[in-house]
């Protein structure tokens, strides 16, 4: 339906607090289904099977949860650097495809700033060329603020979109106003 109606989309993988949930397997399955459009923006940090933090692919940085609402910076664990490199490279390929200038810079081995990456993600989400993947545990309020931040940062405002309806009694077409 998102392709038919030209709607942007994002995938949020839940239950990261459950021991046997594998975020990497979900991302691999999504990639098999949708190809290179899948772009993981975060992935979990686990210790002793527990969901204790996440890696931000855009910023290439780790965050550890310190309580229900707080988090602090932490190094990316060694066992996750391979996945960070893989997901970051996939994201950089998507960023490069945003413009000729970015494509040239990518092939010259140049790096992109966080602001450039974020702007390119927003452009690619809006045209449907990538589908961001986030994760968390809504039950424990982990990852939900990242999801909301990503929606606000990468998706177009609904106020910039017109929507028409048909009045049931008169069959007249009208423009819906969200204000």
Q: What is the role of each PLM region?
A:
Residues 2-179:
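Structural and coupling elements of P-loop NTPases
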């Amino acid at each position: 339906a998102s392709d038919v109606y030209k709607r942007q989309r994002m995938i949020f993988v839940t239950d990261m607090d459950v021991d046997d949930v594998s975020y990497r397997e979900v991302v691999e399955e999504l990639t098999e289904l949708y190809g290179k459009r899948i772009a993981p923006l975060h992935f979990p940090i686990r210790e002793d099977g527990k969901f204790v933090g996440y890696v931000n692919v855009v910023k290439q940085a780790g965050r550890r949860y310190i309580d229900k609402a707080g988090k602090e910076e932490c190094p990316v664990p060694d066992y996750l650097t391979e996945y960070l490199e893989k997901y970051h490279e996939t994201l950089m390929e998507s960023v490069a495809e945003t413009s000729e200038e970015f494509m040239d810079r990518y092939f010259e081995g140049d790096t992109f700033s966080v602001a450039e990456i974020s702007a390119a993600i927003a452009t690619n989400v809006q045209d449907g060329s990538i589908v961001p993947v986030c994760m968390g545990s809504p039950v424990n309020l982990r990852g939900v603020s990242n999801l909301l931040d990503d929606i606000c940062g990468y998706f177009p405002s609904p106020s910039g979109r017109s929507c028409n309806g048909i009045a049931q009694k008169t069959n007249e077409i009208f423009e819906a106003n969200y204000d």
